[in-house]
């Protein structure tokens, strides 16, 4: 990867680009993943490359859902494996969630490489190599594990496709997404939509999970029952508008 100076004002964003590009070279990330990363980065600009209040609100609710779940699962694709495998493993360890590889552009080689990447980051078990169940979808994201996504009650699906998100919700699952675009079908379909950068979101969630594990079950239930996803998305859009107004005022446009 290119050596990026730590004092560069956009160090984290440039590092993310390099990680996804490296993922493509390693065979972990698909070429299409580069496009998805660029699209996400453009929305990150719009929120000021920070975790907004609406994002933090959704992240806390998401952690509560994971901690209360009977069979929580974190779904991992190529971009997630390239960007934050260590953070996935940390969050899974704290919440007791299983990890499952699920890909749109699926090959046995890619699945193997992603599993090895996650295990190198500390994962003891990763599902997805030998899927034995299927969702009602016409592409390879339908292939899932009966121990994982298929029977999960709560699924964290970072950087998700809208159609699979919709199908998982139809199956009665609590679906948590991380998507920087509050207007996407994924964001509008999910149960809990986190409008934040993947790396920031997973880091925040691990921190919250460590703290919230000590809370009473009633407090976690309250977080879930009072959570309003429409409010989250509305506030995320308002935060974009406010950031743009601030930038316009600062530049004199």
UniProtKB/Swiss-Prot annotation:
Residues given in the record as ATP binding sites: 17, 39, 179-181, 185-186, 197-198
UniProt pathway: Cofactor biosynthesis; coenzyme A biosynthesis
Domain of life assignment: Archaea
HAMAP family in alphabetical order: PPS
Function in brief: Catalyzes the condensation of (R)-4-phosphopantoate and beta-alanine to 4'-phosphopantothenate in the CoA biosynthesis pathway.
Full protein name: 4-phosphopantoate--beta-alanine ligase
Family assignment from sequence similarity: Belongs to the archaeal phosphopantothenate synthetase family.
Record GO biological process: coenzyme A biosynthetic process
A GO molecular function held by the record: acid-amino acid ligase activity
Catalytic activity: (R)-4-phosphopantoate + beta-alanine + ATP = (R)-4'-phosphopantothenate + AMP + diphosphate + H(+)
Sorted UniProt keywords: ATP-binding, Coenzyme A biosynthesis, Ligase, Nucleotide-binding
Protein's organism: Methanosarcina mazei (strain ATCC BAA-159 / DSM 3647 / Goe1 / Go1 / JCM 11833 / OCM 88) (Methanosarcina frisia)
Extra remark: Was originally thought to have pantothenate synthetase (PS) activity. Purified recombinant protein shows no PS activity on its own, but the enzyme enables substantial synthesis of 4'-phosphopantothenate from beta-alanine, pantoate and ATP when coupled with E.coli pantothenate kinase. ADP, but not AMP, was detected as a coproduct of the coupled reaction.
Known partners and oligomeric status: Homodimer.
EC number(s) per entry: 6.3.2.36
